[in-house]
Amino acid sequence: SLTAKDKSVVKAFWGKISGKADVVGAEALGRDKMLTAYPQTKTYFSHWADLSPGSGPVKKHGGIIMGAIGKAVGLMDDLVGGMSALSDLHAFKLRVDPGNFKILSHNILVTLAIHFPSDFTPEVHIAVDKFLAAVSAALADKYR
């Protein structure tokens, strides 16, 4: 679980990166050709004409994802309750396999490390990794 120190580190780091969140989201979603290399992710976006990194739909959805993660930063004391509507959406309407959250979380960490090398210290890495795992768990809450 997230400690008070973890929460403080995540909030401070998010303050530094929030201006580039859309770019980070688009790159994370497109990293390693996530939507084409992992067949299980491709099925959720079959209605997009272009799944390539940098395409309009990938950029837009990456921004939406990072916007939701930004909101989650303010909900760290109750991620399950605060993200309940998103959990419902992903579990019941979109039927996203929660294993995909782990792939995306990894891609977000890699993208943050690339864009913010001096700020992405080991302490930040650990706190953000724990935070993204907590967000993933909150999103997967309705799957049980």
Curated annotation (Swiss-Prot):
Family listed: Belongs to the globin family.
Annotated binding of heme b, by residue = 90
Q: Which PANTHER family match?
A: EMBRYONIC ALPHA GLOBIN E1-RELATED, HEMOGLOBIN FAMILY MEMBER
Provide this UniProt record's keywords sorted from A to Z. Answer: Acetylation, Heme, Iron, Metal-binding, Oxygen transport, Transport
Instruction: Kindly give the Pfam families that the UniProt entry links to this protein.
Output: Globin (PF00042)
Instruction: State the GO CC annotations.
Output: blood microparticle; haptoglobin-hemoglobin complex; hemoglobin complex
Its annotated function is as follows:
Involved in oxygen transport from gills to the various peripheral tissues.
Query: Gene3D superfamilies attached here?
Result: Globins (1.10.490.10)
* GO MF term set: haptoglobin binding; heme binding; metal ion binding; organic acid binding; oxygen binding; oxygen carrier activity; peroxidase activity
Q: What are the recorded Gene Ontology BP terms?
A: hydrogen peroxide catabolic process
- Which InterPro entries does the entry mention? Globin (IPR000971), Globin-like_sf (IPR009050), Globin/Proto (IPR012292), Hemoglobin_a-typ (IPR002338), Hemoglobin_oxygen_transport (IPR050056)
The entry describes its oligomerization and partners as:
Heterotetramer of two alpha chains and two beta chains.
Q: What is the tissue specificity?
A: Red blood cells.
Carrying N-acetylserine, the residues are 1
* Superkingdom of the source species: Eukaryota
Q: What is the lineage of its organism?
A: Eukaryota, Metazoa, Chordata, Craniata, Vertebrata
Q: What is this protein called?
A: Hemoglobin subunit alpha-1
Q: Where is the Globin domain?
A: 1-144
Ligand binding (O2): 61
Q: What other note does the entry give for this protein?
A: This hemoglobin has two more residues, 32-Asp-Lys-33, than other fish hemoglobins.
Keyword Iron on this protein?
Answer: yes
